[in-house]
Amino acid sequence: MGNVVAMILAGGQGTRLGVLTERIAKPAVPFGGKYRLIDFTLSNCVNSGIYRVGVLTQYRPHVLAKHIGIGRPWDLDRKDGGVEILPPYVGRNESDWYKGTANAVYQNLEFLEENDAELVLVLSGDHVYAMNYNDLIDYHLLKGADGTIACMEVPLEEASRFGIMITDVEGRIVDFEEKPPKPRSNLASLGIYVFNYEFLKRVLIEDENDPNSSHDFGKDVIPKILRENKGSLYAFRFDGYWRDVGTIRSYWEANLELVLPVPPFNLYDPNWRFFTHSEEMPPAYVAPEARTSTSLISEGAEVYGEVTNSVIFQGVRIGKGTVVKNSVIMTRTEIGENCYLENVIVAENVKIGNNVKMGVGEDAKSKLDPKIYTGLLTVVGMNSTIPDDVVIGKNCVIGVGVKPEDFKTKKLESGDFVLPREE
């Protein structure tokens, strides 16, 4: 195996996650009680023995850069190799932003040269999965491919959300369509690629000089390689757990899968650990009057109420008489006494008063954005404060940084929203 360098695409805005990504990039979104989404890709790298990693940031990079730091939690603080944050290059003839996924890697060819790359892994930093990249690389080398794309079969009705490929009997890709309205196959790209470096360099330079390209791997680079027969691309079929948590519903579902009696995604595998940078906190405390079942409760949490089928992050406090069901409550959120929360996602550093009810009543279409907020789930943005005695229905949205005075009424009907007043 040649020298492998991983390039993690971590600049995504994640607009379909609504208020959850208003202030942070999608790869920085908290997940699973203590992690951020990028932790899974970084952990897969080090568990696969890949210690040369570039993280390509763009949209709101501050939280992500602070989280990764010098890479110590992932054993990536190394003199030889390690992790490097790669923001867009700003020069006299360059824009401040990467123009697409392919352009992002193109702008960092120098980083690949400096690290003597022979094979380049191009990875998304916002999916939840466990993969030994050596299996992908071994398959790539066995086939003598120029590039190999990890893929899996998805339900045909969902296929139009993915890059879809058609292969021959040998596994060679003969056609690729990015998010086709009428898919001819259900073999979906996972956004995980390995390329021979010299081949990748050549096609990226060609793509950069193409005025008609949007400089995206799925939309432009991969289809052109196939269309013009520029190289051999193979499909590596992955049969493990992989989730695209790019919508509010899929994010909520993937979190709650973790509390199933036999979860499809194992956070506890001693042979494939997931690492993160998190604050040191004392053990979780469950009070004598508290009741908990089928939940993840992270360190530093204090539970004085009832928690069922939920994911409770670090430093969360749940007051006496409060009931939390089917919900995701993120770091350092405080919930007062005698509250009721069901089917709710609450972001970081939220303060919820006493006697607050959330996720109650009949479901209704979102008045804010029905394409993003598709029903059932009520979402609260980070750094918000919800005053005492407020009743909030289903499919409601509380924006980022909302203050008590932003609530014009004590009862928010299902589908309604509260946003912070513009200063």
Swiss-Prot record:
**Biological source species:** Thermotoga neapolitana (strain ATCC 49049 / DSM 4359 / NBRC 107923 / NS-E)
The answer, when asked if Lipid biosynthesis is one of the entry's keywords, is no
**Pathway terms, separated by semicolons:** Glycan biosynthesis; glycogen biosynthesis
Q: How does it assemble?
A: Homotetramer.
Protein name per its UniProtKB record: Glucose-1-phosphate adenylyltransferase
Q: Which UniProt keywords apply?
A: ATP-binding, Carbohydrate metabolism, Glycogen biosynthesis, Glycogen metabolism, Nucleotide-binding, Nucleotidyltransferase, Transferase
Q: What is the lineage of its organism?
A: Bacteria, Thermotogati, Thermotogota, Thermotogae, Thermotogales
Keyword hit for Repeat? no
Q: Which PANTHER family match?
A: GLUCOSE-1-PHOSPHATE ADENYLYLTRANSFERASE, GLUCOSE-1-PHOSPHATE ADENYLYLTRANSFERASE-RELATED
**Which family is it part of?**
Belongs to the bacterial/plant glucose-1-phosphate adenylyltransferase family.
**Could you tell me what this protein does?**
Involved in the biosynthesis of ADP-glucose, a building block required for the elongation reactions to produce glycogen. Catalyzes the reaction between ATP and alpha-D-glucose 1-phosphate (G1P) to produce pyrophosphate and ADP-Glc.
Question: Record's InterPro entries?
Answer: ADP-Glc_PPase, ADP_Glu_pyroP_CS, GlgC_bac, GlmU/GlgC-like_hexapep, NTP_transferase_dom, Nucleotide-diphossugar_trans, Trimer_LpxA-like_sf
- CDD domains under this entry? ADP_Glucose_PP (cd02508), LbH_G1P_AT_C (cd04651)
Q: Which residues form a coiled coil?
A: none
Q: Which GO terms describe its biological process?
A: glycogen biosynthetic process
* Encoding gene, per UniProt annotation: glgC
Catalysed reaction per UniProt? alpha-D-glucose 1-phosphate + ATP + H(+) = ADP-alpha-D-glucose + diphosphate
